[in-house]
């Protein structure tokens, strides 16, 4: 029985570790562990996890350290308990333990006492062993790949040495002493390093190198992520921190290299070409009988021309040459791709407007709005006299989109080139890209945002312009949306800044047109470059003349004022007749173009006898505002200055009355301090008929249809509301006419007659004046086709003013005075103030008669014509005048 118990021990001892491990196991209290395992197999109890862990730790200490298993630097999971058949024979427990305690169970923790933990522990141990053995396996594979060819090379070299020894022995036996000396010298030469490189057997080494180079990328791609583990294993370090795989890091570095360096693709192509030539030359050297230099040359020819391999002979040489030719085709395809990408990128850069503009004395427009079309048109007309010019547009839009929008204008630019660039006016680099410092004029357009945001952006653009290191050559014209923001922009920009407050200008012009019908057309002619416009020039030959003589000195122009040099360049419009032109003074005129007029000899004029009629007194008027503008408080102040006492201003809009009072008070308007007008509030929608019918529309002298503040951001919506309100008001007025005859009624009853409806609206227009604020010039045809309204083109007039100030910044002061409620103003006067009916006079005679009223006559409109003529060409030609004719004058507002 004892013998049978010792046999298993002897078998086990043949496979167990050294004696140290056996001694260590004997010293540990592992009896309970073995009993528990045996009991677990018999259904008696479970194993103890704590004792298992202790036994596993003792086993770890006995493994060699280079395997990394016995390291205590990292906490390892305990291995599963060994099978009872292998453990129970090792240490035989006393029989008394089995007899006295047949059902005793060891004390175990609740977490480790469950039987299912054994398979999990076995699986984890297998995974751990696999993770440990994998780097060793990969290292073994790589070592074999590297050293197997090298061992073959050493064997080859050993064989060569043996052959050489045999040859030397044979030659020594049959040669003389002198031959022996020379033979030893030859042997030494043949045994040099160049011998192994140049002899035929060195081609085998080249073949091994080629094969190894072909296999190496696949091995690296497959197992490169295990390289850090091998390094840690060689350094005997263990790191638990998670790291990015090496394959991803390499891909990231390549990506960064190609992204940062602009010539990375070209360098990569050059490296690939050189590598293919060298690799192909080495392969050709291995399969052919030529030299290395010849093989490299053939490799280059195969890369450069894929057809050169057609005459090769031999299977190996053909395979190599075809492979090199295929690589050469790939190289040239990559080269063509790079060239194509470079050309496409350059063309795309030009197409997207990223290139630099190298121009001088050009007009630079910053921003994009619906006013740009009419602005370009006016600037092109202004440049017509000089054979055209250059206009550069910088906006935050795509260049193609801007060019398409400009092409839709269908306007002949008459030699003017329009260059579009995509960029932000707030970025200095983009401003330098359009040669901002060399522009003769810079126009900053208002954005499509609300007034405060648009003016804030304009202020930032002005700050960017002031930050340009090179001094600006030209002046800056800024389109403002709110009059309150104008002083801040001028404060920041200084003397270079000229502002045009578009909203305020249109509001003042609407009031002037409402009080004097037809004035809108006159302002279009004066502000636009198609007809007559303002010019200021120095004429030394006029020094010493009185202004009344200067007035008739220009056959093709009409003098309107003087720029006084002694008063700091102040422009005086409509000066006194006795003002003497001094040295340095300049003359303000209205002319066709800046090169179409010059002073001439004084003509013969006759003042003669004419009626001395004073201006009729002003009578109270009744005016209606349909809509709400954000600067309506300024318009009320202008009306307060123009209207007679007792006038009424009706305000009809959707803004509640209390909110109106708060807005007017915020605009610093004292409603109770108004002396000439009385405010009447009505609430309603101007596009709803029943709301309009509640108003006495037939009693108003003037009706102003304003672009409502709620829809002013949308040009189409605003114009649609204005047009609908205009038609509704005219229709309501025509139905309320007291002199409507029965004929028109029968026409409406028998069937709708468009002409009769238009005729009734024209009759209503004779009773009251309607001024519509139209934002889009295309809406002009819808309003002017029936002549039912005297209209104002807001964007058209603002664009004209911007273009005129861009051409000459001094004109801005002239426009400011003519638009103001004080000082000189543009007026339309009847002919009875200057002549008798059917009197024959020349235009010079009428100009002299106008000076008696302190007025400057600049044009006229005949009763038989629809449009006024400003700056007539033949001023000395006499003609008959009618009392139905009217004259356009610049008169003092005092």
Swiss-Prot record:
Topology class, membrane: Multi-pass membrane protein
Gene Ontology terms, MF aspect: identical protein binding
Gene Ontology terms: biological process: monoatomic ion transmembrane transport; nodulation
Residues of the RCK N-terminal domain: 360-501, 620-769
Record's compositionally biased regions (Polar residues): 7-16, 24-33, 44-63
Pfam families the record matches: Castor_Poll_mid (PF06241), Slo-like_RCK (PF22614)
Top-level taxonomic group: Eukaryota
Coiled-coil portions: 390-415
UniProt key word Transmembrane helix: yes
Swiss-Prot/TrEMBL keywords: Coiled coil, Ion channel, Ion transport, Membrane, Nucleus, Transmembrane, Transmembrane helix, Transport
Subcellular location: Nucleus membrane
Renumbered residue ranges of the record's region Disordered: 1-124
InterPro entries found in the cross-reference section: CASTOR/POLLUX/SYM8-like, CASTOR/POLLUX/SYM8_dom, NAD(P)-bd_dom_sf, RCK_N
Cellular component terms (Gene Ontology): nuclear membrane
Positions of transmembrane segments: 134-154, 204-224, 267-287, 319-339
SUBUNIT field: Homotetramer.
Similarity comment text for this entry: Belongs to the castor/pollux (TC 1.A.1.23) family.
Function in brief: Required for both rhizobial and mycorrhizal symbiosis. Involved in Nod-factor-induced calcium spiking. May induce a change in membrane polarization that activates the opening of a calcium channel required for calcium spiking. Might be calcium gated.
Note: Can restore nodulation to a Medicago truncatula dmi1 mutant.
This protein's name: Probable ion channel SYM8
Source organism (scientific name): Pisum sativum (Garden pea)
């Amino acid at each position: 029985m004892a013998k049978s118990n010792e046999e298993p021990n002897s078998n086990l001892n043949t496979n167990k570790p050294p004696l140290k491990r056996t001694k260590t196991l004997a010293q540990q209290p592992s009896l309970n562990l073995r009993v528990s395992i045996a009991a677990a197999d018999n259904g008696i109890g479970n194993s103890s996890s704590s004792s298992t862990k202790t036994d596993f730790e003792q086993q770890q200490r006995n493994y060699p350290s280079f395997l990394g298993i016995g390291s205590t630097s990292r906490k390892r999971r305990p291995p599963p308990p060994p099978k009872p058949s292998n453990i129970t024979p090792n240490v035989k427990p006393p029989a008394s333990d089995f007899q006295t305690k047949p059902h005793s169970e060891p004390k175990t923790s609740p977490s480790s006492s469950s039987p299912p933990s054994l398979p999990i522990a076995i699986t984890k141990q297998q995974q751990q062993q696999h993770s440990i053995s994998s780097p060793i396996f990969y290292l073994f594979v790589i070592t074999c790949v590297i050293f197997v060819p090298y061992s073959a090379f050493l064997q080859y070299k050993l064989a060569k040495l043996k052959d050489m020894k045999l040859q030397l022995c044979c030659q020594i036996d049959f040669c003389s002493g002198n031959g022996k000396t020379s033979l030893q010298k030859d042997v030494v030469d043949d045994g040099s390093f160049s011998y192994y490189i140049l002899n035929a057997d060195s081609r085998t080494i080249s073949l091994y190198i080629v094969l190894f180079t072909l296999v190496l990328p696949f091995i690296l791609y497959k197992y490169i992520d295990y390289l850090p583990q091998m390094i840690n294993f060689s350094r005997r370090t263990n790191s638990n921190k998670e790291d990015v795989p090496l394959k991803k890091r390499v891909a990231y570095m390549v990506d960064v290299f190609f992204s940062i360096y602009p010539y990375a693709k070209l360098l990569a192509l050059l490296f690939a070409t050189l590598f293919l030539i060298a690799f192909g030359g080495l392969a050709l050297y291995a399969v052919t009988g030529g030299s290395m230099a010849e093989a490299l040359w053939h490799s280059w020819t195969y890369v450069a021309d894929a057809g050169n391999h057609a005459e090769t002979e031999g299977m190996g040489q053909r395979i190599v040459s075809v492979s090199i030719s295929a690589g050469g085709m790939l190289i040239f395809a990559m080269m063509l791709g790079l060239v194509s990408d470079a050309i496409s990128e350059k063309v795309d850069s030009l197409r997207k407007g990223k290139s630099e503009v190298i121009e001088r004395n050009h007009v630079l427009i910053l921003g994009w709005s619906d006013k740009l079309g009419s602005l370009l048109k006016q600037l092109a007309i202004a440049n017509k006299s000089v054979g055209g010019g250059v206009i550069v547009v910088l906006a935050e839009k795509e260049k193609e989109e801007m060019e398409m929008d400009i092409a839709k204008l269908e306007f002949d630019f008459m030699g003017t080139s329009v260059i579009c660039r995509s960029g932000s006016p707030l970025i200095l680099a983009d401003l330098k890209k359009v040669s901002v410092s060399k522009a003769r004029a810079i126009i900053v357009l208002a954005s499509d945002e609300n007034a405060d945001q648009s003016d804030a952006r304009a202020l930032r653009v002005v700050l960017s312009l002031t930050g340009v290191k090179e001094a600006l050559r030209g002046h800056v014209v800024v389109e403002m949306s709110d009059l309150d923001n104008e002083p801040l922009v001028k404060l920041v920009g200084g003397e270079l800044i000229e502002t045009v407050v578009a909203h305020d200008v249109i509001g003042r012009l609407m009031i002037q047109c409402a009080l004097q019908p037809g004035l809108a057309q006159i302002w279009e002619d004066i502000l636009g470059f198609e007809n007559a416009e303002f010019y200021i020039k120095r004429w030394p030959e006029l020094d010493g003349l009185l202004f009344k003589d200067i007035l008739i000195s220009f056959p093709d122009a009409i003098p309107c004022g003087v720029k006084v040099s002694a008063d700091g360049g102040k422009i005086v419009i409509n000066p006194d007749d006795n003002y003497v032109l001094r040295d340095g003074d300049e003359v303000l005129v209205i002319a066709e173009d800046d090169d179409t007029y010059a002073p001439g000899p004084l003509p013969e004029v006759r003042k003669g006898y004419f009626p001395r009629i004073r201006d009729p007194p002003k009578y109270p008027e009744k005016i209606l505002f349909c809509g709400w503008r954000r600067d309506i408080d300024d318009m009320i102040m202008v009306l307060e200055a123009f209207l007679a006492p007792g006038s009424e201003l009706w305000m009809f809009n959707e803004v509640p009355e209390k909110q109106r009072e708060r807005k007017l008070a915020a605009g610093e308007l004292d409603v109770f301090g108004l002396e000439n007008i009385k405010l009447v509030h009505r609430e309603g929608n101007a596009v709803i008929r029943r709301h309009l019918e509640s108003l006495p529309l037939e009693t108003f002298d003037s009706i102003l249809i304003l672009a409502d503040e709620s829809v002013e951001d949308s040009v189409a919506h605003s114009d649609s509301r204005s047009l609908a309100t205009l038609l509704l008001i005219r229709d309501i007025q025509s139905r309320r006419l007291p002199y409507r005859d029965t004929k028109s009624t029968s026409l409406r009853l028998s069937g709708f007659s468009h002409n009769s409806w238009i005729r009734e609206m024209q009759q209503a227009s004779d009773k009251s004046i309607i001024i519509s604020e139209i934002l889009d010039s295309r809406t002009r045809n819808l309003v002017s086709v029936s002549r039912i309204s005297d209209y104002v083109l807001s964007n058209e007039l603002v664009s004209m003013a911007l273009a005129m100030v861009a051409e000459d910044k001094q004109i801005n002061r002239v426009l400011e005075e003519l638009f103001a409620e004080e000082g000189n103003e543009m007026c339309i006067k009847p002919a009875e103030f200057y002549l008798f009916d059917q009197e024959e006079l020349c235009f010079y005679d009428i100009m002299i008669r106008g000076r008696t009223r302190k007025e400057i006559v600049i044009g006229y409109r005949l009763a038989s014509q629809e449009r006024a003529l400003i700056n007539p060409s033949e001023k000395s030609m006499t003609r008959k005048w009618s009392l139905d004719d009217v004259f356009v004058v610049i008169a003092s507002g005092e």
